[in-house]
Regions:
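Sec-dependent N-terminal signal peptides
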Residues: 3-12
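Short, Lys/Arg-enriched, disordered terminal segments
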Residues: 1-4, 17-19
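A "functional boundary" signal
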Residues: 15-259
C-alpha cells in the first residue's frame, strides 16, 4: 500500500525533474517484477521465527522471538503483529518480566499510532512505569511518544494544534536520541527526521539520512523510510530531480523489504 502512494508521488513529481533517473526507473521495474520473491523470502523468515518460538521453552527467549515477529509484521500487517503483542504481554505477565511487559505495551502503542488510534496509544503509554536506569526502555518509550506526536502533527497540519504537537515530538525525539547509540542507522534516521521537522539546514538533513542509508541495506525498512523523508526535504527545497531519485530509492526499498 505504501508503494502505491510513493509511485503516485513519483508520477506527479517526475515531469518537473531536470533528469529522468532512467537507471533507477529500470531498477524499480526489475524490483517490482521480483516482488513475489521478496515477499516469499520475508514470509520464510517469519515462519522460521514462529517455528523457533514454538519449541523454545525459556520465557525470555520466547519473548524475544515474539518481539521479533511484531517488528517483522508491523506496521503494515496490523492483525498479525497484534497477535504477538498479546502473546508477549500475556507471557511477560505470567513470567513476572516487567521489562518485557513494558516493551510489548510500547509495541502496542506504536501499532495503535500506525492505525490512527491516538487516544488508545496515549493511554497505553501513560500507564507505564519506566525505570530511569533502563536505557533501552527509555529509548523505546521516547520513540513511541515521538511517533505519536509526529503523527498527530501530520494529522493536524496547518491547524492551531500543529505547533503544539511538533514541540512535543521534538521533546521526545531529543530524549530518544540521548538514549541511543550514535553508531546506528536508526539514530541518524531519527536525527534526520528531527532536523526535517524543525526546518534544519538541508545539508544536515541530507547528511544524517544518507548516513542512515549507508549503515543499512535497501531491503531494510529503515533504508526506505530514510529515503522517503529525504525526498520530502528535497521537495520542500524545490530540488525535484533529487526528490525523484529518493522517491525511487524508497519505492525499491518498500518492495524489497516486503512491507
Amino acid at each position: 500500500m505504501r508503494l502505491l502512494f510513493i509511485l503516485i508521488s513519483i508520477c506527479f513529481s517526475a515531469f518537473r525533474a531536470q533528469a529522468d533517473n532512467k537507471k533507477l526507473y529500470q531498477q524499480l521495474d526489475s524490483v517490482i517484477a521480483h516482488r513475489a520473491d521478496y515477499h516469499a523470502l520475508k514470509d520464510k523468515e517469519l515462519q522460521n521465527v514462529k517455528l523457533s518460538a514454538t519449541y523454545v521453552t525459556d520465557a525470555e527467549e520466547k519473548l524475544r522471538l515474539y518481539e521479533q515477529l511484531v517488528n517483522g509484521y508491523s506496521p503494515y500487517i496490523y492483525d498479525s503483529a497484534m497477535v504477538y503483542v498479546q502473546k508477549g504481554t500475556h507471557l511477560a505477565q505470567q513470567s513476572h518480566l516487567s521489562a518485557y511487559y513494558n516493551r510489548f505495551q510500547m509495541l502496542k502503542a506504536r501499532l495503535y499510532v500506525f492505525r490512527g488510534f491516538y487516544i488508545e496509544a496515549k493511554q497505553c503509554l501513560e500507564q507505564l512505569n519506566i525505570p530511569p536506569s533502563d536505557t533501552h526502555q527509555n529509548y523505546l518509550y521516547n520513540c513511541a511518544q515521538s511517533a505519536l506526536y509526529f503523527s498527530l502533527n501530520v494529522y493536524c497540519e496547518n491547524s492551531e494544534f500543529s505547533e503544539h504537537y511538533k514541540k512535543l515530538f521534538n521533546e521526545y525525539i531529543t530524549k530518544a536520541l540521548y538514549y541511543y547509540s550514535k553508531q546506528d542507522a536508526q539514530y541518524y534516521r531519527l536525527k534526520g527526521v528531527q532536523l526535517y521537522l524543525s526546518d534544519g539546514p538541508l545539508k544536515d538533513i541530507s547528511a544524517c539520512l544518507n548516513k542512515a542509508m549507508s549503515l543499512t541495506k535497501p531491503n531494510n525498512p529503515l533504508y526506505g523510510m530514510s529515503a522517503f523523508v529525504l525526498s520530502k526535504a528535497y521537495r520542500k527545497h524545490k530540488q525535484y530531480e533529487l526528490q525523484e531519485r529518493y522517491l525511487l530509492l524508497a519505492a525499491m526499498s518498500d518492495v524489497m523489504s516486503s512491507s
